[in-house]
């Protein structure tokens, strides 16, 4: 039988994909509904596969994306809550 465990996704890959998604939305490449669909699919995949890193490293990377304008407040909240990284989570 094959191993059904999915390999975790690197923090660098997550950052790259979130930047690409944000740039596509800002440039008009993705309509709002297409962006929402892709964002939700990405979050689902991250929940299934996990991110390869500890909470501090992941949050540092996400904070950089927020600071640089790649994650708006709504996307930030959805991403961190969906991945269990919101305030008060361990």
Go through the PLM ranges and name each one:
Residues 1-90:
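Acidic, Ser/Pro/Thr-rich low-complexity regulatory regions
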């Amino acid at each position: 039988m094959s191993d059904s465990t999915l390999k975790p996704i690197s923090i660098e890959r997550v950052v790259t994909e979130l930047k690409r998604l944000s740039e596509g939305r800002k440039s008009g490449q993705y309509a709002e509904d297409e962006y929402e669909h892709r964002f939700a699919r990405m979050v689902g995949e991250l929940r299934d596969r996990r991110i390869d890193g500890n909470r501090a490293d992941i949050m540092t990377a996400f904070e950089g994306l927020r600071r640089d304008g790649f994650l708006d407040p709504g996307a930030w909240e959805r991403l961190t809550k969906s991945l269990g990284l919101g305030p008060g989570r361990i």
